[in-house]
Amino acid sequence: MQRILEPEIMDEFEQARAYAGADFAEPNERFVSHFEKKFPGFGHGAVIDLGCGPGDIVLRLAQRHPALTVHGLDDSRPMLGFGAARLWDMHELQGRVQFIEGILPGAQLPLLCYDAVVSNSLLHHLHDPSVLWRSIPEIGRPGAAVLVMDLFRPVSAAAAREIVETHAGGEPELLKRDFLNSLCAAFEPEEVRVQLRAHGLAHLEVETVSDRHLLVSGRLPG
């Protein structure tokens, strides 16, 4: 199946509300678990989540690791609003968590570099994937941990629809539509490997970790 682009920014309030209200606890918790398994002992320093959406992974990382500073970057103001509303009630995280509105490349970040750069479900939104792979070495310090999880494109439209019904059959139609569009906009694992080689990141590992997710992990040179 050929890739079908989708909008890069979820800037409609209803779309953001549907996404923020959906149950992504299982994949988001799995993302945090992948981070902890790939980088055992990583409990201090600064982490940035690129394309953080409503901030669930940002908040999970900060809750699990009290010595971490965690920043979330997204270009959707409605999405960030839902994250900020949750943070407002989490007094123990305030001062360690910050949400930033901005777009890659060139976003104005609170820190010059980060000890870890993570991203979940941003890659498939990007019309030009090199935006992500160029930004990670610019944002992460030498030797920084890198963890990117995203959907991968199924072999056919029928397979994509089956995945939607399996994992989001009970969700609102708006969310099911967006999920299908995201699957169709995602990259195949080998396409991601080609992207990494083109940006000097061929040492990063690419693996499939579910029936719909791929994982890129490793450290920046240095």
List where the protein language model places each region.
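N-terminal, positively charged/glycine-rich alpha-helical extensions of SAM-dependent methyltransferases
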Residues: 1-18
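Conserved alpha-helix/loop element of class I SAM-dependent methyltransferases that forms part
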Residues: 25-44
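Class I SAM-dependent methyltransferase SAM/SAH-binding core
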Residues: 48, 56-106
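A short glycine-rich, Lys/Arg-flanked "PGG" loop and its adjoining helix->strand segment in the class I
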Residues: 131-142
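Conserved beta-strand signature within the Rossmann-like core of class I S-adenosyl-L-methionine
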Residues: 143-150
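C-terminal alpha-helical "lid/dimerization" subdomain adjacent to the S-adenosyl-L-methionine
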Residues: 151-199, 205-207
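Core SAM-dependent methyltransferase catalytic element
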Residues: 202-222
